[in-house]
Structure formats: C-alpha cells, structure tokens
Amino acid sequence: MKALMFGWEFPPHILGGLGTASYGLTQGMAAQGDMETTFVIPRPYGDEDKSFLRIIGAGDTPVVYRDVNYDYVRERLKGKMDPELYYRLRDHIYADFSYLPTNDLGCFEFSGKYQDNLLEEINNYSIVAGVIARSEPFDIIHSHDWLTYPAGIHAKQLTGKPLVVHVHATDFDRSRGNVNPTVFGIEMDGMNHADHIITVSDLTRRTVIEKYHQDPAKVTTVHNAVTPLAPSILALPDRRGVRDKVVTFLGRITMQKGCEYFVEAAAKVLERTQDVRFIMAGSGDMMDAMIRLAAERNISDRFHFTGFMKGQQVYEVFKASDVYVMPSVSEPFGISPLEAMQCG
C-alpha cells in the first residue's frame, strides 16, 4: 500500500512533538514491509532521513509554470528534489496561480514554522497538495493535525482516495477551552471529510466524539511510542556539574503545558530548601512571561531556561535530572514523559 502523508514537521528540524511522532509512525509503517510512504512537508532542508520514505517539499513543488533549464533546477534543489520530479510535478499544475507570489521556480516560499502568516501557508500548502496528488501514485491519504487537513481534503476531492486524519491534539487542548473559531472550523472540516480518524489517546478520542460530533465507529486510538534508545544515548554521562537536585520541565512553553504551575511550584519548594535547581527546557510564546515570573518570585538564580532542545540534547538534560515534571493542563499524549522514563 502507498500512503500520501501530509505533515508540518519532520526531524531533524522540529518545533515540538508533532515531528517526532510523525517520524516514529512512518518508521513503524515502513517496518511492516508492505507500506510505502511519501511524506510532504512545507520546507525540507535536505538532511532528513529518507532511508524508509520519500520526502517531497511543498516549497520545492511548482504551482506556476517557469521555463527553467535542467542544470539550474538541479543546482537550486540540490539535496532536496531531483529535477525529473520537479518537471513531472510541473506537468500537473492544474490551475492559474500566477496571481500569487512565487519564486524563480514557480514555487511558494514556506517558513515551515508557526508564524503570523500561518493560515496563508496552510492555504498555499493545500494548493501544492493538489499538484502532488495529481502526479503521485497512492492508495490512501494521511494528514497530521489541523495544519494539513485542508491539504488532505483537497487531495481526496481530486482523487477520490480515502482520507485518514491523525489528531495529535485539538484546539480544546491547546487553548484551555478558549477555542479559536478558525482553527476549530478547520479541525471540524477535516474530521467531517475523513473516512477515518486516528487519535493519540482515549482522552482525545472522547474529545473528537463529544466536541466535534464524530461517529465513534470511525475514531480509533493509536497511542504514540518511542524508539528504543541507542547504546550511545544510554551511556550518556550526568554532566550537571552541581551537587544540587535537578527538577526539569521539557516541552513547549505555552498555555497548554501549564508552565506557570512549574514556576510557582519551584518557588514553594525553594521556600523549604535551597539545594534544588530547576530547568525549563523548551521555547514558546510564554517563555518571556515565565522568565519574568521567575524573577518576580526571586528564584532566577535557581532557574535555568535552556531554549528549544532536540535530539541528543534532550537526553543530556534528562540524564542530568532527578525529577521530570509534566504540569500540562491538557495532554493528549505526551512523548516527553516516555523519553524521560527511558532515561530512568
């Protein structure tokens, strides 16, 4: 079976757990022996692991015809896309998108992040999905989270192939119930068009059924997992450099993750003992607020903000920690606690 999969992140360039989950899932699918996956991301860098899947960059897929020669295409897309694929995709441009801003190859520019023009990028990504769906052979469409639901819907409408949407979280989780109506509408549209829905936990399944009014028969829970650690990771030493106990939060520093509770709890602990240090590893829109909160509680000298961490950095932090804390107010299925448990 061939799957056309849409996702917003893929390692090593990730911004959260979505890319990590996508990597593990596609790796597991490839291990079944009868699955071939083509994974579409907004902006590939060329250093992604392609040993078990194909990667197509939405930002390398033409939506406007440009008369460019082979050598130029090869140089511009070096390490990301073969010229043959570029020309094949160009032959499947299905409408006039010349009124939209594109580059010298007739492609949209994508940040691949979560910027202020995110809705514009989501729309452009869905346009690209139409070009790819017309040119690629596949049996099923798989869309990860709301950002790629419009792309999945478009691919289904063009080809009639079945659509599976994979719900890693809903806006009820991300917003503490203060739902963004635009995001909610995109989520609802994706679920309504889906032939089947995968959720990462029974909690998320209940949310999908109750809040999005989906038929329970078409919603299945498939839990996340982690890959067994390599011996080199297991052998990482504890490099904390202090005798103090270390308590760690690792995740997106956002409203959903309850990061302010971690800071407040740290302040209460430090009222009783001073031989503890606290690490807040990650990044997000509440990071500056958490730095200010730590200063207001006069605990900045015991608090360490590392910024975003990935790969081996994550395991180095866990190896140097005594306690991992997950104060999330809503957690569909956290991958970080599994990674922490792997480190003991």
Task: Pin down the residues of each PLM region.
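A conserved catalytic-core segment of Leloir-type glycosyltransferases
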Residues: 35-133
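Conserved donor-binding/catalytic core segment of Leloir-type glycosyltransferases
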Residues: 198, 241-266, 279
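Carbohydrate-associated surface elements
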Residues: 203, 225
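Nucleotide-activated donor-binding/catalytic signature segment of Leloir-type glycosyltransferases, i.e.
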Residues: 289-309
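Short alpha-helical donor nucleotide-sugar binding micro-motif in glycosyltransferases
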Residues: 308-309, 316-321
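Aromatic "clamp/platform" in nucleotide-sugar-dependent glycosyltransferases that forms part
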Residues: 329
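Short glycine/serine-rich donor-binding loops of glycosyltransferases
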Residues: 334-337
